[in-house]
């Protein structure tokens, strides 16, 4: 069997679900950044940017909310609710250290973001989104 013919087919789903955010990440705790929400990948991950160019979008992992993974029970509902709350709206974010002590984890900045002065994590909880991710 010619495995080299099959490998691109196996990789295609991963590529199709890759997020488009490619901007430079804030790398110090306390760094403030903001932008319009351009992309929501899951229930606690999103991208903000001030232009329509994905190479400027900052990928964020919310520090104050742990959504279920997309393939777990409640994961898609969490993502959909986050989209409804923030998509296209301006967020003000502050980079913070995650549980590992790092600000950047898995090519995402750990941050607390606010929408109209309210923490996005609090908005998700108020909307009834359950926590349960990693």
Kindly give the residue locations of the regions a language model identified.
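Sec-dependent signal peptide hydrophobic core
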Residues: 4-8
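Small beta-barrel nucleic-acid-binding modules, primarily SNase/OB-fold domains
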Residues: 2-3, 14-134
């Amino acid at each position: 069997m010619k495995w080299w013919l099959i490998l691109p087919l196996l990789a295609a789903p991963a590529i199709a679900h890759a997020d488009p955010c490619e901007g430079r990440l804030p790398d110090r705790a306390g760094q403030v950044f903001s932008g319009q929400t351009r992309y929501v990948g899951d229930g606690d991950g999103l991208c903000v940017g001030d232009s329509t160019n994905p190479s400027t979008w900052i990928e964020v992992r919310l520090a104050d909310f742990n959504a279920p993974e997309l393939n777990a029970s409640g994961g898609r509902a969490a993502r959909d609710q986050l989209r409804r709350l923030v998509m296209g709206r301006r967020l003000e974010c502050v980079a913070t250290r995650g549980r590992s002590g790092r600000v950047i984890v898995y090519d995402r900045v750990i941050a607390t973001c606010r929408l109209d002065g309210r923490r996005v994590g609090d908005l998700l909880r108020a909307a009834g989104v359950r926590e349960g991710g990693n």
